[in-house]
Amino acid sequence: MENNDTPVFKKVESIIFSVLSPKTVKKMASAKIVTPELYDKEGYPVDGGLMDARLGVIDPGLKCKTCGAKLKECPGHFGYISLARPVMHIKFISVIYDLLRSTCRECGRILIPKKEIEKCMDELKNVEIECGPEERRLKIKEIIRTLKTINKCPYCKSRQQKITLEKPTTFLENEKRISPIEIRTRLEKITDDDCKVFGLDPNSVRPEWMVLTIMAIPPVTMRPSITLESGERS
């Protein structure tokens, strides 16, 4: 049998890494996980459980409830869990720490005047053109070090408090713990324009997305269950 498809060659110019928003996680998911139960008494996946058949199947005799395909044809589908309370994403703790110390605790603005912001953006642009993205990242770190020393907001004039981090994920403001709920609320106040000063593209990542309210659940095919000695699946 002849294959008449002509191969297409394209060059990848760039890759953009982003953080999934809660809205995106929900949109790409096929099921909401609401119960810790995995299988019913007959051994079939429980709807709304981590082995929900809408996330794909690992048993040869079953069909996926999302695409209708069997094990070999179904790639699997994501689900999601709505968290009862926001949770800090461990991989972004250092970024969150910098953002909290560099923005106003009241209005959320970056702690430098508007004219200085424009100057910073011009400098970052020139550094990237002349020296590359790595030098741009170093310049951003330099800007953040300067912001940490400012104790009064140039916009709302509120006094800033000292913020410290008790590893791995506990933030303190004047020795008082800041909850993930409050941290997320503060990060929501940061404007898209201010995000760019920190090297964040607001179209790909918003600061508040680093504090999880929705957790993506991988397809069943990525995490097959095992059978215990008792005959139960886990």
Model-derived segments and their meaning:
Residues 1-234:
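Conserved core architecture of multi-subunit DNA-directed RNA polymerases
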